[in-house]
């Protein structure tokens, strides 16, 4: 397995992977999310590749105060092999190299399988409520 920065050639393969991982939501346009990330620090957008196939992704960010991780997904046929752990580990190292003191990940409360994985990796439940506001409307995907 190789973990590397996203390349433009990965575009369609990544969107297909996100569909298989059930990461897409009607209110997010994945094509726009990728375009925006490519225009703003693509070095924190990582893919895991096995035999030339993209089998995992994580999209990271850093605002100078905290890091974040989005679009963490692993192809169903490749789960249980440590790919998600490796992607997060690489992202964390990149954030630490930038002086990032902490990372935040938003997870649906009912996603017990993923919550357990994050807890095993040292993530803790933060007693905060995540609020959001759409600033630019995307087309429904």
From Swiss-Prot:
GO MF terms, alphabetically ordered: acyltransferase activity, transferring groups other than amino-acyl groups
EC numbers for this chain: 2.3.1.-
Pfam families: Acetyltransf_1
UniProt superkingdom: Bacteria
Keyword set, alphabetical order: Acyltransferase, Transferase
Residue span, N-acetyltransferase domain: 1-141
HAMAP family associated with the record: Acetyltransf_YpeA (MF_01127)
Family from the record: Belongs to the acetyltransferase family. YpeA subfamily.
Protein name: Acetyltransferase YpeA
């Amino acid at each position: 397995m190789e973990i590397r920065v996203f390349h433009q050639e990965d575009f369609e393969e990544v969107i297909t992977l996100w569909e298989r991982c059930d990461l897409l939501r009607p209110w997010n346009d994945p094509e726009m999310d990728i375009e925006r990330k490519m225009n703003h620090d693509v070095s924190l957008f990582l893919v895991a590749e096995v035999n030339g196939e993209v089998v995992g992704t994580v999209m990271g960010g850093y605002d100078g105060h905290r890091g974040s991780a989005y679009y963490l997904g692993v192809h169903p046929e490749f789960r249980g092999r440590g790919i998600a752990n490796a992607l997060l580990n690489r992202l964390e190292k990149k954030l630490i190299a930038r002086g990032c003191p902490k990372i935040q990940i938003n997870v649906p409360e009912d996603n017990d399988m993923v919550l357990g994985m994050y807890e095993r990796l040292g993530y803790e439940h933060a007693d905060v409520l995540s609020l959001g506001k759409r600033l630019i409307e995307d087309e429904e995907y």
